């Protein structure tokens, strides 16, 4: 299956000059969704790890089924105030300000190996925040897997030193 053809490009969303890769078309197509999950499973099954970290919110969509198939635990990373128990947090930069991501303080034990799974790699900024959370708790990120990588935005360069994998790569924007 050519999964790349299954994504919808929405030009100038959420603002002028952005080529937004819409994953909903993949999710709506049962065969494409299954192929996407199977592909992510194949990307990480050779790694030695115990937990999958799924960032809010699309990391939940892809991280949960991969964790299920590979019989791994799933750790959720949420925006501030969304988790009910004590948390560890990290502040990160957005285009128009700052935001905070959190993880339960007991989600990862020191020395545990994790894989981060998310929908899309753009600049890598959000992933770096997820890595900081894992490492604050003493975990080790042994792999990072994305359904989509926008290679023209240089995210992989910003994640140097980490094992970065992706199912589909877009080499240029449609804008």
From Swiss-Prot:
Reactions listed under catalytic activity: AMP + diphosphate = 5-phospho-alpha-D-ribose 1-diphosphate + adenine
EC number: 2.4.2.7
Signal peptide: none
Keywords: Cytoplasm, Glycosyltransferase, Purine salvage, Transferase
rRNA processing found in the keyword field: no
GO MF assignments: adenine binding; adenine phosphoribosyltransferase activity; AMP binding
PROSITE patterns xrefs: PUR_PYR_PR_TRANSFER
GO CC terms of this entry: cytoplasm
Location in the cell: Cytoplasm
Pfam families for this protein: Pribosyltran (PF00156)
The organism's place on the tree of life at top rank: Bacteria
GO biological process: adenine salvage; AMP salvage; purine ribonucleoside salvage
Protein's UniProt keywords contain Transferase: yes
Chief place where the protein resides: cytoplasm
Pathway: Purine metabolism; AMP biosynthesis via salvage pathway; AMP from adenine: step 1/1
Quaternary structure and partners: Homodimer.
PANTHER family: ADENINE PHOSPHORIBOSYLTRANSFERASE
Entries under HAMAP family matching the protein: Aden_phosphoribosyltr
Family from the record: Belongs to the purine/pyrimidine phosphoribosyltransferase family.
Role summary: Catalyzes a salvage reaction resulting in the formation of AMP, that is energically less costly than de novo synthesis.
The protein's name in its UniProt record: Adenine phosphoribosyltransferase
Originating organism: Caldicellulosiruptor bescii (strain ATCC BAA-1888 / DSM 6725 / KCTC 15123 / Z-1320) (Anaerocellum thermophilum)
Organism phylogeny: Bacteria, Bacillati, Bacillota, Bacillota incertae sedis, Caldicellulosiruptorales
């Amino acid at each position: 299956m050519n999964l790349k053809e299954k994504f919808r490009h929405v030009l100038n969303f959420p603002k002028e000059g952005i080529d937004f890769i819409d994953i909903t078309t993949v999710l709506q197509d049962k065969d494409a969704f299954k192929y996407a999950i199977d592909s992510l499973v194949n990307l990480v099954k050779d790694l030695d790890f115990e937990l999958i970290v799924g960032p809010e919110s699309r990391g939940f969509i892809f991280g949960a089924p991969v964790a299920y198939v590979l019989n791994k635990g799933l750790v959720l990373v949420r925006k501030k105030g969304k988790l009910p128990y004590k948390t560890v947090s990290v502040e990160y930069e957005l285009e128009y300000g700052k935001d905070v991501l959190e993880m339960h303080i007991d989600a990862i034990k020191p020395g545990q190996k994790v894989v981060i799974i998310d929908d899309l790699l753009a600049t890598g900024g959000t992933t770096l925040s997820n890595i900081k959370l894992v490492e604050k708790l003493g975990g080790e990120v042994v792999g990072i897997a994305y359904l989509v990588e926008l290679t023209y935005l240089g995210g992989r360069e910003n994640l140097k030193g980490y094992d970065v994998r992706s199912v589909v790569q877009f080499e240029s924007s449609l804008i």
